[in-house]
Amino acid sequence: MINDRLKVMFKSLKDDWETPQEVFDSLNREFEFTLDVCSSDHNAKCTKYFTPEDDGLSKDWFNDVCFMNPPYGRVIGKWIEKAHKESLKGALVVCLIPARTDTIWWHKWVMLADEVRLVKGRLKFGNRKNMKFGKSNSAPFPSAIVIFKHKVATDFTSATPTFVSQKEFNRN
């Protein structure tokens, strides 16, 4: 029997990971977001945001500079596809996602992105004020920042990965 600690290494028990504030702040200084497309009332990062009840997948994003930290479960591919398609309509979409380079959605959609920033180490997700015992836990997976700029799609893979560390987010 695999103990609970090992289970987390192979599969997370949750699919919503609250964006670390310093990561959002650093990206927001660079992009000036106008819409958080995957949010809840308690963790929205922008004044304008979509909750699960709003169903961001069914909304238009094309007039916005979008921040997206989607649910990390099986539906993530639909969110990455939506980000790509909305960029073709004029949206700029910055995605914080798990770096699952072995998945179909990664090869089909992420590789069409304008930029992929692979985060060194593991991000510490969540609101640190709400963590048990005042500590946050590192994610059981590596993360990436994927950027879809408003442009015409190409038929070839165009993303060139760069590397950033969580410490770099704290410097800005």
Regions found by a protein language model. Give the residues of each.
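Class I S-adenosyl-L-methionine-dependent methyltransferase catalytic core
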Residues: 1-172
